[in-house]
Amino acid sequence: MSSCSRTRTKAPRSARSRRNGGFSSSSATIVADIDDVLIQILSFLPIKTLLRFKRVSKRWLSLITNPVFSNRVIKSNHPLPISGFFLHSPREIKYSFVSLDDDATNQRISSSLPLWFTDHQTDMIIMQSTNGLLLCKCSCASSNHFNTNYYVYNPTTKQYTLLHQIAGHIALSLAFDPSRSPHYKVFCLRGRSNNSFSSASDSELYHIEVYSSNEGLWRRVVPVPTSPSTFIEFSYSVFWNGAVNWYGFSSRDCLSFDINTQEIKILPLPDHEHEDEPLPDPRILMFLDESQGNLYYIEVNNQSSSNLRVYEMESNSSSWSVKYNVDLEPLAAAFPEMIRTEYYTDRRIYAFSVIGFVKEETDAASYILLHIPNQAVKYNFIDKTFKKLCDFKSLVNDAPEDHFYRFQRTFQFIKSLANV
């Protein structure tokens, strides 16, 4: 065999690199450049599209789930729109889900939606919803006793974090503003135990602790100089305007804690129309929630009145104003099943509850979602039009007469890529 036939031609370096399973520096640069372009394109897409694109390839999955990318998308699209509501049944720990997405016309309602994680098969109870994240709890049996675990959960990505053990607390609240920080905080209103904080003043019966997702631990923030009776019914909370606000159905005020200034103040709820009216009964409607940066409040003390007032407090304000008036009479004419007779007075009442308030970019597009017997109805504030959104008949056939138009609590669902 000639020498030339034995001579092996040396392959180019880039070819050898590919054949050996590696990439040259120029190839890596090209891939990085392609990723940069792809990230630019993906960042303009809605979150529901990004969720579908996660299944395209492992590379796309890696890009979309990268915390830097997800935080960039969330911040550029804030405030994110409400995509639906979780509805808690008063009879069991199950959640129905009502979708507001236009492409969910034929599947608006999902029934018997359990919330549980792989390491805890017991159902979760939602405590609060804030900008796409849920604060949840569950009771888990361990060594002949029950422990209550608390989680921060992203229902969009199915990610969750177990908070460090919490004991002896009075109230919790979740704070998350992705336009300011990718990290969330959980605030705990706690009473002083006999063997803790012995150096604290006897007047400091309560204090606030904070858990930061970037630190992963609890720390004491500030004492609360107030009387014990202030917190008896403060079992609910809403995060609004950089502050956590605790409230209860038997109180006329909210306890507000500004997370930046660490200032504690009382946020009064709107005054009664008549001073001689009693305080709201827990069985009568009370609704307080945030939407697109503003705070909204609805209270019903007289179910025979056809006028439903919606109060608003803007982010740059400290006072309430009547934003909308809802006339229930045309709604009752179209849906006569919401007219009931109160059994102990024989008076005519309107059977309804509030699922949620949705503020859009314009007042003309904003609406309230009401729950009337067996169905959810969307009511537009400005043009006074309404339409049935979904049917609850399959969910409520076994419910008692006085409960089947009410859900115990509702929670916003916002699609988010936020990391927990």
From Swiss-Prot:
Span of domain F-box: 27-77
Listed Gene3D superfamilies: 1.20.1280.50, Kelch-type beta propeller
Residue stretches of biased makeup (Basic residues): 7-19
Region of interest (Disordered), residue spans: 1-25
Signal sequence region: none
Domain of life: Eukaryota
PROSITE patterns, A to Z: FBOX (PS50181)
Any one Pfam family match given in the protein's UniProt record, by short name: b-prop_At3g26010-like
Protein name, per record: F-box protein At5g07610
